[in-house]
């Protein structure tokens, strides 16, 4: 994640760096990304990049968190703890719609297609109930499939809704 130096930059400069990251990581995989293109686009010194981020992976993860925070906010993310199949289904639909309509579409699509496997797996709490874990895994798989193969969206959505309903029956 970014350093405190980055956090204390004027908002306009943070936005410029973030926009340069989005341009780079939307056009190039993490493996092919270059600091040189980022610093040229952001109009910052190469040394400044390394004051803001440890490396390209750190910068990528920062941008990924920014994108998810914005997309989840616009998709109306819900943090309820009770299992509700329809709410989870609608959250996936809203998330996909927000990604499709956002500046992050190419970045998120490339994340699933090329970059996800290059990053460390996010830890999942061992206290997460099995049904919540199943819904989470299923939802993320559905999002990935829809974004990578948009023509399959209707089929994936129906399969997701059906499976979540089965999980709901198990929960009730």
Question: Model regions: which residues?
Answer:
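Secondary-structure edge/capping motif, primarily at the C-terminal ends of alpha-helices
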Residues: 75-79, 106, 146-150
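Alpha-helical DNA-contacting segments of helix-turn-helix folds
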Residues: 16, 53, 57-70, 106-115
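Hydrophobic alpha-helical connector segments
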Residues: 76-101
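Hydrophobic/aromatic-rich alpha-helical bundle segments in the mid-to-C-terminal region
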Residues: 122-172
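Ser/Thr-centered, proline-biased regulatory motifs
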Residues: 31-37
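Basic, helix-initiating cap at the start of DNA-binding domains
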Residues: 1-24, 37
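Alpha-helical structural segments
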Residues: 12, 19-23, 27, 41, ...
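Short hydrophobic/aromatic patch on the recognition helix
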Residues: 43-53
């Amino acid at each position: 994640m970014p350093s405190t130096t980055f956090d204390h930059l004027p908002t306009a400069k943070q936005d410029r760096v973030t926009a340069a990251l989005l341009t780079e990581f939307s056009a190039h995989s993490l493996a092919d990304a270059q600091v040189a293109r980022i610093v040229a686009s952001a109009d910052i010194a190469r040394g400044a990049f390394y004051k803001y981020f440890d490396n390209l992976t750190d910068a990528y993860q920062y941008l990924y968190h920014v994108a998810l925070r914005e997309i989840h906010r616009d998709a109306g993310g819900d943090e309820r703890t009770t299992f509700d199949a329809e709410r989870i289904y609608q959250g996936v639909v809203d998330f996909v719609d927000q990604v499709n309509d956002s500046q992050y579409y190419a970045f998120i699509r490339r994340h699933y297609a090329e970059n996800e496997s290059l990053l460390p797996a996010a830890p999942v709490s061992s206290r997460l109930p099995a049904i919540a874990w199943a819904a989470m895994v299923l939802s993320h798989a559905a999002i990935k499939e829809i974004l990578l193969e948009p023509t399959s969206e209707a089929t994936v959505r129906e399969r997701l809704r059906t499976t979540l309903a089965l999980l709901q029956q198990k929960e009730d």
